[in-house]
């Protein structure tokens, strides 16, 4: 194996995101697909991961046991569901494997487990691995510092019908970026639903609206609205490959890290801007 290469394992190999990750891993220079995982009992077990993803034969067989492939990867990439990700996290912590986590919907206990594991292993944990989204988060911080104290702030997000959590992790990250720039805690100022007689809008709050429809990959808009004008900052994703490439880029970046909790802005160096 070339010194620059890093071997990755992909969780949820048969899912929409898993297949994109396999394609990206097989195409990206410096990355080697080392393992592909599916749940116990899946009809996809025993398949060639590359053929499953439509990327050609890879020689990597889809398996259900992390123990069986523990020597085949350096970084584990997980875009599944919180309960599965936390199981994988415990394994990676035990065996000293890095992780790239794109799973959303964690409760506070799950997030704390990730923080604790990062004391021993290196983790990139991000709500969205798109370069464009992370540039947007930086722009939101700057817009909030200028407009946030006198404008009404609303975040609108849209995803496909199969997404199971709301608001999206990216929408929450947008809210946290804005709230942080205003020296607020999002938990204290977020409004997640409006129905019936709500009264007038409460100043200083951040509203969220959610759409679930069709096959929308992901659309996010933050609105800063004042009397007579408004500024909207929008990101639209047309392919999951942008998230997959960002995740693989993060795995390569982790190569030199022993431990710590990072996000995509660290990978891209956006905090120095």
Curated annotation (Swiss-Prot):
GO terms for biological process: diaminopimelate biosynthetic process; lysine biosynthetic process via diaminopimelate. Pathway: Amino-acid biosynthesis; L-lysine biosynthesis via DAP pathway; (S)-tetrahydrodipicolinate from L-aspartate: step 4/4. NAD(+) binds at residues 12-17, 38, 102-104, 126-129. Pfam families: DapB_C, DapB_N. One of its GO terms (cellular component) is cytosol. It is found in: Cytoplasm. Its EC number is 1.17.1.8. Homotetramer. Belongs to the DapB family. This is 4-hydroxy-tetrahydrodipicolinate reductase. The gene is dapB.
